[in-house]
Amino acid sequence: MITLLNKNKLFLYCLVVIISSSFFASLIQTSFGKVDVKLMNLKTPDGQNLVYDLYKPSIATENDKQPLIVVVPGFQRSKEALSNIAIELSRRGYVVALIDPYAQGMSSSSLSRLAATTQGYGMFALVDYAYAENFSFVDINKIGSTGHSMGGNAAIRGADYFGKEAIKSGKKSKLDSVYISGYVLTLRENILRDSKSNMGVSYALYDEGAFRNDLQGWDAGNMKIAPESLRTVNS
């Protein structure tokens, strides 16, 4: 009997800890009620499903539109992997769409063999959707994207994709700015030349993927001298 009571006490204690932790985690995620977080599903024009978390700060209204940033996680990562980025950006007043890239998390698999180049793993469709003024609280002239690793490649490809579109239409790029983290392989001249987006790059000096970069050895990740970063600055 005593053993059973002790087990019940332990169970209740664990239950209280779980509920309390979940409550405080929710407060942090919503910046103590200042940000509304919703799970969304976008049915894209090509019949796919893009699942994302929409972080909407209370200051974002129809009369006070705010910038939108689409956040793209890296390879084999669901949206929760970059929730810290979404939380911090939304705390600062940005509307954030944190996506599950195609074939990851709850989003559908891609119908394209070039999902980064032609779709940005779903980011392109969401930028188009936002630019069409489907979010009344978003300033469509200030739409940006950021991603890490594979998500960084999506951001680079987005700058190229929407840049080409802007050149054809003679209008401003739908993707105003991109910030690339941990990926420089596609910072090539043939991709950068059509970009019409503001661009920032972050890369670790000893990134584990630096062996694939243009430079070799210890300088492979040195963005002070790397051809990839110099091409970006001079593009």
Task: Indicate residue ranges for each PLM-predicted region.
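N-terminal Sec-pathway targeting helices
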Residues: 1-17
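N-terminal cap/lid segment of alpha/beta-hydrolase-fold proteins
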Residues: 25-64
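Short substrate-entry loop that stabilizes the transition state in hydrolases
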Residues: 61-65, 74-107, 209-211
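Glycine-rich His-Gly loop
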Residues: 71-75, 149, 204
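Alpha/beta-hydrolase active-site loop
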Residues: 81, 113-137, 157
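Gly/Ala-rich beta-loop-alpha elbow adjacent to hydrolase catalytic centers
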Residues: 147-151, 155
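Conserved hydrolase catalytic core segment
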Residues: 158-175
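The feature captures the conserved acid-bearing segment of alpha/beta-hydrolase catalytic domains
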Residues: 170-234
